[in-house]
Amino acid sequence: GFQGVALDTLRVSTLGRGGSDLTAVAIAGAIEADVCEIYTDVDGIYTTDPRIEPKAKKLDKISYDEMLELASLGAKVLQNRSVEMAKKLNVNLVSRSSFTPEVEGTLITKEENIMEKPIVSGIALDKNQVRVGMYGVTDKPGIAASIFTSLADENINVDMIVQTVGVDGKTDLDFTIPTTDWEICKGVMEKFQTQAENIDYNEKICKVSIVG
């Protein structure tokens, strides 16, 4: 399930992370299966990470879009591509544990199939974040765009962005990046040292996202 063969060239390709799940969904869609069960090491999709919050509740159902949102924000139960394909092929997914198969998992389905939808579906936590703070930045058009363009050129995904209202020609700019991009980001930010009075980094943060 982790590799595929191109029909025209017969070349073997590795599908990458989540390839087995992706293959299962594709087969389920092709044979028009009622459901595709994905077995992991947890009983299903929880309202938040049960390893951090013991009172987290297992969800009976969640929509494709909400599952994709949780996954993009740090929840690591299901891989994004498998959920995207399930939505495209209209395949109902069930996430459940291979260690406790007697426990009903979580159904990932179309939103209209969920009769009683909670206001908040889940809370995603991402501890692999670094806050980059630029203080006393020259407040003129194009500075922020230049910074973010340089980061994008290095394939650094900038997430949360906060910029203060300019005072006396100066402004403060804060944004978050993945911890894995920290060292590369430092190299990029060195080019903008003259544009700010101070640049600092804080890796002791956690991003909390509410999905609903």
Question: What does each of the following model-derived ranges do?
Answer:
Residues 1-212:
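C-terminal catalytic "cap/lid" subdomain
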